[in-house]
Amino acid sequence: LTAARRLGVRPWPFALATVWLANTASLLLPVSNLTNLLLVDRTGWSVATYVGRMWLPALVALGVSVLLLALLLRRDLVGRYEHPDPPVPHDRALFRLAVAVCLLLGPAFVLGVPPWLVGCVAALVLAVAFAVRRRSELRLGLVPWQLVVTTLALFLVVGLLEQHGLTAWLTTVAGSGPDSLGLLLRTAFTGAVASNLVNNLPAYLALEPVASSSPDRLLALLIGTNLGPLITLWGSLATLLWRDRCRSGDLTVSWTRFAVAGAIGVPILLVTSTLALWLTR
């Protein structure tokens, strides 16, 4: 939003592209999404094993997302802009430290360091640095408390429903049998619908026992829960955070416009990425 406004262009196309890619580009690495971490924890796969299975579906999802966004937003991406002078960091030392921490996150994840440890160390380093140099920037308001409470409530609701037959019902909806293309698509679409109804994290946890009959079904479920939550504004944690940032940035998000774009794009994304998964079995 800041970059778009500095350039004097309409922020909506870039905001929509950000939330789409935050979801669809998260398939490639096991640390890119909490649902990916849940799958890796379930299967015990290494980073190499996961990437070996998901590289093609992830690249297909990324390419199709960019193509769809270009088509859906073509009228908004017309015109010229002047390139402004780059902004000067308020604190160069903090800026360089933050860049270094971000650059080290990827290699640390790939080398197999537990994600929780990487995240905690990175957060601690930056928190200490800000406490020393810009203490006023550290506020409890930076923590998205409403998001935390909402997500916990969704987990509790799904847990209660599981005790009252949710898993059996989801098994009927998602289907069973050999891993045909049809069953993988059914699993992916079930995950997408569930994600848009409740949120992709509780949706994945609820459907994981149903899809655990094979690694391919778990990956199809991951495709559904990562690519699917682009229709409702609560479909994923990324979407919830994005909406909160849009609100704080004075950008009004039209749920209708968001939902229409998602309703057009999600089925195409699910079919193409699931087909790529099926072809690389």
Each PLM stretch: what is its role?
Residues C102-D216:
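Transmembrane helical segments that form the transport core of multi-pass membrane transport proteins
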Residues V9, A48-R92, L97, I231-R281:
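Juxtamembrane and boundary regions of transmembrane helices in multi-pass small-molecule transporters
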Residues A17-L29, P89-C102, Q146-L161, I264-L270:
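Small-residue-rich segments of transmembrane alpha-helices in multi-pass membrane proteins
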Residues A3-R5, L71-D76, L111, A127-R135, ...:
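Structural signal for the C-terminal ends of transmembrane alpha-helices
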Residues N36-V51, R80-E82, H164-G177, Y204, ...:
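Membrane-interface helix termini and inter-helical loops of multi-pass transporters
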Residues L29-N36, L117, N196-L207, T232-L241:
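Transmembrane helix boundary and interhelical junction motifs in multipass membrane proteins
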